[in-house]
Amino acid sequence: TRVKSSAASDVYKRQYRDLAIEQKKLAPQKDNYWKYESKKVKRLLFRLVNYIQPDTIVDAGRLAASSLYLKAGKEGADYTAASELSELFLEAGVPVGFLYLHDYRHPEFMEEVFRICVARACGKSVFVIEGIRYTSQMKALWKRMQQDEHVGITFDLYDLGILFFDKTKIKQNYIVNF
């Protein structure tokens, strides 16, 4: 269920604590990438999913602790994890409500996943792209994503980019210190 009101802060704190405990329990089974992912980014992902309440969540990149936060944001959402293109199975006609694209060491993979998912984006879709300033290739890819005809408002959080697809708003690119 979606968290609202001033009591949301307490609810979020409780959920963050529970997710951190679950993450620590699973850590021995995972690689170092699982442990060192940014807490701030994981919490942002949780809040975005919780606010948007997407029916479909796509997590494209190496399996990481962020998967716990994405799933917890909306329980019951159709969650798809793909660390390579062959794992990206999406039902025909089903829109992608939320995409977390975080394999910035492989810009070709990110571009292909974006191409597949942008065709399935709807007005409520939100895509979060990690590593937008990691390399010159990623900077160029981020610029192309911002200029895509489907994309409306974008937020550049320096290492993270957020794309909104609501075309009722005027297309605008914001740079925000995060």
Q: Model regions: which residues?
A:
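Single conserved hydrophobic/aromatic residue that forms the stacking wall/gate
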Residues: 1-8, 12
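A glycine-rich, hydrophobic loop/mini-helix early in the fold
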Residues: 16, 22-37
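SAM cofactor-binding core of SAM-dependent methyltransferases
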Residues: 32-94
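A conditional alpha-helix N-cap/helix-loop micro-motif detector
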Residues: 38-39, 106-110
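Short, surface-exposed connector motifs at secondary-structure boundaries
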Residues: 52-54, 96, 122-127
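Short His-Asn-centered micro-motif
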Residues: 59-61, 82-83, 101-103, 129-132
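Short SAM/SAH-binding signature in class I
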Residues: 94-101
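C-terminal substrate-binding/active-site "lid" region of AdoMet-derived donor-dependent transferases
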Residues: 109-178
